[in-house]
Amino acid sequence: MTSLKRSQTERPVTADRASVVSTDGAPKVHTDDFYMRRFRSQNGSLGSSVMAAVGPPRSEGPHHITSTPGVPKMGVRARIADWPPRKENVKESSRSSQEIETSSCLESLSSKGSPVSQGSSVSLNSNDSAMLKSIQNTLKNKTGPAESMDSRFLMPEAYPSSPRKALRRIRQRSNSDITISELDVDSFDECISPTYKSGPSLHREYGSTSSIDKQGTSGDSFFDLLKGYKDDRSDRGPTPTKLSDFLITGGGKGSGFSLDVIDGPISQRENLRLFKEREKPLKRRSKSETGDSSIFRKLRNAKGEELGKSSDLEDNRSEDSVRPWTCPKCFAHYDVQSILFDLNEAIMNRHNVIKRRNTTTGASAAAVASLVSGPLSHSASFSSPMGSTEDLNSKGSLGMDQGDDKSNELVMSCPYFRNEIGGEGERKISLSKSNSGSFSGCESTSFESALSSHCTNAGVAVLEVPKESLMLHLDRVKRYTVEHVDLGAYYYRKFFYQKEHWNYFGADENLGPVAVSIRREKPEDMKENGSPYNYRIIFRTSELMTLRGSVLEDAIPSTAKHSTARGLPLKEVLEHVIPELNVQCLRLAFNTPKVTEQLMKLDEQGLNYQQKVGIMYCKAGQSTEEEMYNNESAGPAFEEFLQLLGERVRLKGFEKYRAQLDTKTDSTGTHSLYTTYKDYEIMFHVSTMLPYTPNNKQQLLRKRHIGNDIVTIVFQEPGAQPFSPKNIRSHFQHVFVIVRAHNPCTESVCYSVAVTRSRDVPSFGPPIPKGVTFPKSNVFRDFLLAKVINAENAAHKSEKFRAMATRTRQEYLKDLAEKNVTNTPIDPSGKFPFISLASKKKEKSKPYPGAELSSMGAIVWAVRAKDYNKAMEFDCLLGISSEFIVLIEQETKSVAFNCSCRDVIGWTSSDTSLKIFYERGECVSVESFISGEDIKEIVRRLQFVSKGCESVEMTLRRNGLGQLGFHVNYEGIVADVEPYGYAWQAGLRQGSRLVEICKVAVATLSHEQMIDLLRTSVTVKVVIIPPHDDCTPRRSCSETYRMPVMEYQMNEGISYEFKFPFRNNNKWQRNASKGAHSPQVPSQLQSPMTSRLNAGKGDGKMPPPERAANIPRSISSDGRPLERRLSPGSDIYVTVSSMALARSQCRNSPSNLSSSSETGSGGGTYRQKSMPEGFGVSRRSPASIDRQNTQSDISGSGKSTPSWQRSEDSLADQMEPTCHLPAVSKVLPAFRESPSGRLMRQDPVVHLSPNKQGHSDSHYSSHSSSNTLSSNASSAHSDEKWYDGDRTESDLNSYNYLQGTSADSGIDTASYGPSHGSTASLGASTSSPRSGPGKEKVAPLWHSSSEVLSLADRTLETEGHGMDRKAESSLSLDIHSKSQGGSSPLSRENSTFSINDAASHTSTMSSRHSASPVVFSSARSSPKEELHPTASSQLAPSFSSSSSSSSGPRTFYPRQGATSKYLIGWKKPEGTINSVGFMDTRKRHQSDGNEIAHTRLRASTRDLQASPKPTSKSTIEEDLKKLIDLESPTPESQKNFKFHALSSPQSPFPTTPTSRRALHRTLSDESIYSSQREHFFTSRASLLDQALPNDVLFSSTYPSLPKSLPLRRPSYTLGMKSLHGEFSASDSSLTDIQETRRQPIPDPGLMPLPDAASDLDWSNLVDAAKAYEVQRASFFAASDENHRPLSAASNSDQLEEQALVQMKSYSSKDPSPTLASKVDQLEGMLKMLREDLKKEKEDKAQLQAEVEHLREDNLRLQEESQNASDKLKKFTEWVFNTIDMS
């Protein structure tokens, strides 16, 4: 036989392809016989031994092996074909050192004859032939037919010298050219066999010219196969390793081999197995041949080999499933990517060619798919530029990706791409409102996560946050978060650079080049925790993931002593943290600046703050790449867009980031578009600004730049065809952001956005809201720039760019490890004298148990988390650092959940599972499946890093009335507990936070649902988070400091501007849904400063809210009145919230949702109070506080103005607003969903609309009866119904607040309703804003009742101020009720004001916050309402009975008793309007008299309730007398009382109150405001509150004692207060005051009450009250007829006269004028303060401008100085030179 002729370096595997001659020496040429194919491996390497001896290599034609190729080589084919140097050029190179070393090995396979091209032949001996056959069989069996599919065509190219390369015809470059039908059945079966699948797939990776996939797997293991056949030449051990490495490199670089993505993981495992089989023996041999004379080294090696053997067995057992590497628990990770660091994966990937693949990616992949999916019509539009369609052949035939089937008018679904068309949002795995039933169905609802201070999952990077940076993290409310940035890359720069540390480099046998940086430090904050020293470590491999973090010295077992100045041996530290690392390979690096700079460059390789973005211009009717590139110039719509996006810059001489554009010769155009965003510089490659080539269809000058941009913006004019990436041919364009203009070049121009990204690019934010358009604004610009930046950052995580970055990183590391190291090992004490062998080895001390739990970085546990949204579980890593809790999904290697540790409020743990509650009760669940101790460790860690605590589960029993005995507000916080009741005995305490009710998470429930669940469940099992030691509820940092997230109500068709505020860059405007009356009301964001100011008012003289002793029921747990909460979706909500915010001091609490935070108080303040400001420990009445703070209340939280302007005005002065988007409140869903933007019933908010009031009243009253205490229910429950009809905006506003109220667990919510109602009523009477013809927006009833009162008092401002108007209406309502009130009890009820209502009203008023409640008697309350009140009053008694024993403070919270069911403001059925107690201002603290009186009244009420008597009237009278006595010191209070009494004079309290349940005890309950009220409001409210017995906490059922019920003063005032939300009394009072100032209407004055000593005739009281009401009504009517609701003019005169007479007779003394004067004074002061603030701001702006000018001048002067000095220097030199010359 003739021998094979081949180069020494050509692998023998290709022998089967060489020509074979017969035994007689004559060469035989075989054509490509179909029947012979089965004997060869498909498309590949070795055939059978028979074929080796019989057949020639397969060829496309009958060309002889020595002939030239039959197909001409042109273009890329020619380059590829000639790539391996030809024989002539390589003859010497084949003798390179590496190849020479392996020559003998190859000679054993083939004779040393000349290459085939020389034509000489040498015969093979029998041994050679047998060995070849054996090799062939082995290869066939081991690598499988699949592995060799491409090898016979591709393998020759993998070698530097291929003797037959030049002579061999170009084969198909991929098996995709070979259809499966060309293979016979046998070979096909082999291809589809499992064995085949484990190797490379049948088809090649799609690729274009430079991305041909060559499979070199067989080359990787070739020398392993040869080892079995080389009997001699044992001295050549190292050679195969080097050659193998060489071949791997060649195959990688030359061929870009890759495996199909589909089979990638299997191939990785197979490669890992082959690598280990080959590498392990080499490792052992190299160890034994190192020649190291150290005994310790040898001993260590022996031990290592034993360990290696055992690990080899493990590897063999798990070769199909390589377990992820787990870092020791003692290691605290610095950032997220460190947690994802996987040492096993690094080992595997180092030898896996998959990272070297360079395949068709980006838009080209889509183009490829479009070709494969249809018949291969090589149309010009889709063919590749060189006409090589095979470049576009993809894996299409085998499981081609079909896209995501998401399309719209902007973008089409496309293979290999994923579309984002709006509404996608971020993944949510926690159990929260967003994924509960009420929200899940609303696709139109979208949360603008970018506005939330909650970091997005993709935006989480650094986990170890220094204490000094914590406050910075609180201020995360930046509009958009930059995502997918490895900010941990600064770890070396921050903690190592220019500090004492050690760098070690080396080449590990498994990991390749590695670099380790280690530093020992003594952190200041660690002293408290025990371990004084900490080791910071960075471990770098060729993989992009880097291990960064720290380990406490006490957590490291060591032979040395801990906590000494010398420290532990670094070797022991590294061996403990990274046991897989061979530390002996490490050598100390040079301590030079070059090394540190190179390390920083290596670490920060992935950080790039300069980005280039392409912009393609698509005109109407266009869709293809050529059409877009051939648009020579920009149209007006495009120019308008470009002007918004960036700055047009002249390229010539441009010195900033130029993005490969020519800035010298204008060869790439004269101008371009440039901009900056945050820290990023962005240069746009605008297609119309790049050079246009008239005769070049492809416009290569343009495509050269845009085609190489990763992110491209496609701007579409109206009428453009939907965009599809398949029309683009580019390997780099991975993300397209499609922007379509609507109504371009008009004032209403707006843009819609869609995104399509390559499938391996992770999703990125900010999310696109569904069905919205963005108006032209800076907000849209920021949104788009953030989207573009995040798109590029995310694209760098795709496989293509990661592979490129990995290669770069490997080269950096290699250079460092080879050229920048000393000979110093990591353990310099390496060799000891032999004598040391005899000594006993020193044992390592055990680490301090649990030491790592005090680390600042993230400690990690492997757990299984529950995805509540998808109802599935997934494996993940739980990381808990000092700042963050993160769950990282192992499969996707992405963060699935994150929250701040300061947001954790508690947890429920068992042996194997843990449920963590955070923020407002949302929760995540994890299970431990590795160690039973994991959960205990996690709990200890949570105790260390958070302020939460273990939850408590308890079963609650009902009392005889079916009541549970506690009040819960809408946040799930227990506001009051009946002393010694069943709930109290079970351990429930005020401030406890319910997180689960009957296994249902409270976070998923609305307040109404919560109450229903408590009321209807047979067995009530609750899980609570116990309060702090001072009884304040546990709150998350978000609730306290963070602006609430506003939930945008997106109805399709509404322009984006109405959904997001773009009017100001700083503010987000929200408008209600389409139906909303004032869609454009700008919600003003309150600047933090403003909020602080507002908050400050309350704070100034009060203890911190946390200290507040009581949580008003009506107030949200954060202290904001519940009713204040509006649905964020509604206009009113926005307005109200803004107003409320303006008033509320810190309404940030989630409860504040409603507060859009326009008003500074709510939104602006980051500090949330657990209680209303008014409720400080001192429990001062809010009113007083308001007053006290009035002067300081610059923000004018008291503004009652409904319009945003008001808040804006006050806020304007303040600093830039923070996002006030109200947090999405539980109330929101209903309101938001309702098309009109009305509050939905969902929140038991009382709707004010007068029409409904009556009905809802009754309904409500029943609700109210269901006090939370009674556990029955939330008054709110029926709230909505009250106003289902039309609600005035004010109603809505109040409703929102009411909703908050309802949160009170139904306590007094009804009252709230009325409060709102009253306000609404005002509006209604005025004309219920909705019902009224104008449906003018009633000022949001946000104003505290006092405000409303004050409004009423004042003269209601103008129609413009809806609030004022509402207030007026309220007044009018009152008047009406007066006029009508004379008649029956019903009328009295009408007056709705029945004391009960009044009381509640007052409460509300007192809370002041509920301005709306103030006048809320519903002007139109239907007769039914009136009737219902009676029922409610009945309820009231029970309430009172339940709370009869409660002391003043307890009374502070009105019970939800039915009594207050009708809010004071409810109208009579006839439509009479009862004025609400305008005592909002009552000062609770005022001489404490009010409180005492109130308490007593309540007590008496309770007593009455306890012993119901048929003659409730007398009882009530007595109670009233008592109240009057108590309040006598405050004439105003007396007046208030009188007023209330008047409001419902005829009917016994029970009747009237019945209509409403007492409001929650809010500040008003405290009577806090009554005395403080500047106006009659004060006294009335407080008296009323006191008078109302509704204070009873627990009546859940309507008490059957209708008459005896002494109405507790309803929380009506509370309701008002609630409206304000957290507003402290000061807020409301301030607001009222301000309004009062605004409205200079003279106050008719408080109705004088008789002295305490004087006898009171009940009938007289009633008459007086009526008369007074009439008088006031007429008074207000006169001041503003427009606002006067329904007062009967005919009767007004008479009534007025009567009232005057009665007032004279009854008033023992005139109202004190001092109050009014004080108010005026305060108002004047406030005005001055505002002016001063405005001036200060102007001055500040001027100063800033001056400073800027000075800086510019300074720079200019410096430059001039420098120039002058340079000139002087030159002159001096010249002078000296001339002197020297002379």
Curated annotation (Swiss-Prot):
Instruction: Name the residue ranges with Basic and acidic residues bias.
Output: 84-94, 1358-1368
Q: Keyword check for Ubl conjugation, yes or no.
A: yes
Q: In what residue span(s) does the PDZ domain sit?
A: 953-1031
Per UniProt, subcellular location reads as: Cytoplasm, Cytoskeleton; Postsynaptic density; Synapse, Synaptosome
The biological process GO terms on file are: actin cytoskeleton organization; activation of GTPase activity; ephrin receptor signaling pathway; regulation of axonogenesis; regulation of dendritic spine morphogenesis; regulation of GTPase activity; regulation of small GTPase mediated signal transduction; regulation of synaptic plasticity
Modified residue annotations for Asymmetric dimethylarginine:
R1580
Residues bearing Phosphoserine?
Answer: 162, 187, 193, 208, 255, 288, 1078, 1087, 1116, 1127, 1149, 1170, 1181, 1234, 1249, 1305, 1328, 1345, 1369-1370, 1391, 1410, 1412, 1507, 1528, 1533, 1544, 1547, 1564, 1567, 1582, 1624, 1626, 1629, 1687, 1690, 1707-1708, 1712
Database matches in InterPro entries:
PDZ, PDZ_sf, Rap/Ran-GAP_sf, Rap/Ran_GAP_dom, Rap1_Ran_GAP, SIPA1L_C
User: How is this chain modified after translation?
Assistant: Ubiquitinated and degraded by the SCF(BTRC) following phosphorylation by PLK2. Phosphorylated at Ser-1328 by CDK5, creating a docking site for the POLO box domains of PLK2. Subsequently, PLK2 binds and phosphorylates SIPA1L1, leading to ubiquitination and degradation by the proteasome.
Q: Which CDD domains match?
A: PDZ_SIPA1-like (cd06745)
Q: Could you list this entry's UniProt keywords, alphabetically sorted.
A: Coiled coil, Cytoplasm, Cytoskeleton, GTPase activation, Methylation, Phosphoprotein, Synapse, Synaptosome, Ubl conjugation
Give an example GO molecular function: GTPase activator activity
A GO cellular component entry from the record: postsynaptic density
Name the PROSITE patterns for this protein. PDZ (PS50106), RAPGAP (PS50085)
Domain Rap-GAP, residue spans: 599-816
Q: List residues modified as Phosphothreonine.
A: T1309, T1530
Q: Which residues form a coiled coil?
A: 1713-1773
Q: What does this protein do?
A: Stimulates the GTPase activity of RAP2A. Promotes reorganization of the actin cytoskeleton and recruits DLG4 to F-actin. Contributes to the regulation of dendritic spine morphogenesis.
Self-association and partners = Interacts with DLG4, PDLIM5, PDLIM7 and LZTS3. Interacts with the actin cytoskeleton. Interacts (via PDZ domain) with EPHA4 (via PDZ motif); controls neuronal morphology through regulation of the RAP1 (RAP1A or RAP1B) and RAP2 (RAP2A, RAP2B or RAP2C) GTPases.
The name this protein goes by in its record: Signal-induced proliferation-associated 1-like protein 1
Q: Which gene encodes it?
A: Sipa1l1
